[in-house]
């Protein structure tokens, strides 16, 4: 009789554990589903794309950003992420056009009381500047950097903790520092300019508010 009682207690404990695990799983699933339902169209896909960007899976990231744009054609996070992924893949012309399209869209549609939108616009100019800088078009890069700083200097002050962890760089190059450097170099006679410093250029990171 005692062994039977002990056996029943063990069965009851297993049942309680299984029910608790099932309940936790259902709440987790429901939280994910609610997040997908409650989020604005395209946000879930953009978060997936951002994760892939951080993992260096640029083709996959473009797929998720395209999926976001399919349901929300003016999703600025998707537009920005897609442009960054194109640049990281070396598809420079497509990336530049994507940044320019984002800048044009925000310039004509942005409300003055939209600080997040202003941060994205500043990042768009900063990222296009980085693209042009890497491509050797330093005057155009400088113009983009200055425009980014004029719109929202704080938004392009430098990549945050996420980038420092992902890229292992505690002191990434900032837009302001790079703009000052280019401006100083362009003021020199052409044969004295040093506009490419590979170890410093490698510290430049894309900006995605």
Question: Where do the model's predicted regions map?
Answer:
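Terminal, low-structured helical/coil segments at or just beyond the last alpha-helical repeat
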Residues: 2-12, 16, 157-209
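Flexible helix-coil transition and linker loops at the boundaries of alpha-helical arrays
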Residues: 33-36, 103-119, 154-165
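Alpha-helical segment of the N-proximal tetratricopeptide repeat
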Residues: 38-71
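Canonical tetratricopeptide repeat
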Residues: 47, 81, 120, 127, ...
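TPR alpha-solenoid repeat register
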Residues: 78, 112, 124, 157-158, ...
């Amino acid at each position: 009789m005692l062994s039977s009682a002990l056996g029943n207690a063990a069965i009851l404990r297993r049942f309680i554990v299984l029910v608790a695990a099932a309940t936790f799983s259902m709440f987790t699933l429901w939280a994910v589903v609610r997040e997908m339902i409650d989020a604005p169209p395209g946000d879930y896909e953009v978060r997936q794309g951002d994760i892939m960007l951080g993992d260096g899976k640029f083709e996959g990231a473009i797929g998720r950003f395209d999926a976001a744009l399919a349901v929300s054609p003016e999703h600025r996070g998707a537009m920005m992420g897609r442009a960054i992924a194109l640049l990281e893949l070396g598809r420079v012309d497509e990336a530049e056009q994507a940044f320019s399209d984002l800048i044009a869209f925000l310039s004509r549609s942005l409300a003055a009381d939209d600080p997040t939108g202003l941060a994205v616009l500043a990042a768009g100019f900063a990222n296009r500047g980085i693209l042009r800088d890497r491509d050797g078009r330093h005057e155009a890069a400088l113009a983009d950097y200055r425009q980014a700083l004029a719109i929202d200097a704080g938004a392009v002050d430098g990549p945050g903790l996420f980038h420092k962890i992902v890229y292992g760089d505690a002191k990434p190059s900032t837009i302001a520092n790079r703009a000052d450097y280019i401006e100083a170099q362009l003021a020199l006679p052409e044969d004295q300019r040093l506009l490419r410093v590979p170890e410093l250029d490698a510290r430049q990171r894309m900006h995605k508010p």
